[in-house]
Amino acid sequence: MQIHPLDTEEIGLKTLEKHLIRTHTQKQLHVGVPKEHSVDEGRVSISPGGVRILSANGHKIRVEQGAGADAKFTDQEYSEAGAEIVESTEYTFDQADIIVKVAPLTPEEMTWVQGNQTIISALHLGSQEEAFFTNILK
């Protein structure tokens, strides 16, 4: 029997796509989005679209009231996307597994960080003093 290279799919295995049922065994993350307090910072770390995606995957998002105002996102947009709107920066940090910011942590915000939290933000290495790094390592 002679096999031609273009005819090999006839003797090979054919695959069938199958949808897998996913169970919700993944960890639910609590994400805090504080308002940026720097005068020259108009960005926010997560848009309402990002909140919608995270919420749809079972994560809890806390956004500080007015956090998206300078970026032209309203609290209502965040709320409709699935975020809980909170009144204070301190409460944004409370019970959060992850804190996401654009600017580096302020000295006041560092006092609210708990040992088990992950901070995602810029560091601005060139403008930080030694005390910043000492506090962040605690």
Where are these regions (language model features)?
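Structural/interface elements that position substrates and couple domains in central-metabolism enzymes
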Residues: 1-134
